[in-house]
Amino acid sequence: APGGGKVIQGIDLTIPDNKLVVITGPNGGGKTTLAKLISGLEKPDSGQILLDGQDITDLDITERAKLGISYAFQQPVRFKGLTVADLLELAAGQTLSEQEACSYLIRVGLCAKEYINREVNATLSGGEIKRIELATVLARHTRLTIFDEPEAGIDLWSFNNLIGVFQELQESLNGSMIIISHQER
């Protein structure tokens, strides 16, 4: 923390298998720091981070990703020249048929035929890019996905729809999800 203080201390958190956990609190309360510690983007000064009893504290983000931990940033990355289908294949780590790629988009509430060949760029709205990011989570088959303030950059209507998408996503995933939010709904 600026000035050398501790941002987070005394945390004992267990994320159950196949559950959706929402962590809320005020801005500056350490929510994003917690997400970055779990994902491996930041290292703790002390303590342990365990995944299924295995100490992963010293593993970096790449090693944790190989174990099935993924982190979705507040503002998803946009790629000029990369289509939605390309992004889904990158997430899956394999070539997908058009039907497979479209099935991920349909599950997050997007009309697949309209989006599958679109570029992941500034022409997509905040809500669209969030849904595409959720589709990549489905394609990735991760054990633990951390969403850091997924409501950032989208309007209230899109946010309310996104809540439903998260609930449906949780039911179809074979893994856990953490949503970090300053919204207390």
List each model region and its residues.
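ABC ATPase C-loop
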Residues: 137-138
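Walker B catalytic motif
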Residues: 149-150, 157
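Helix-to-loop junction immediately C-terminal to a conserved catalytic motif
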Residues: 39
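ABC ATPase NBD coupling module
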Residues: 55-70
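Conserved ABC transporter NBD signature motif
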Residues: 47-54, 67, 100
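The feature captures the beta-strand-to-loop junction immediately N-terminal to the Walker
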Residues: 24-26
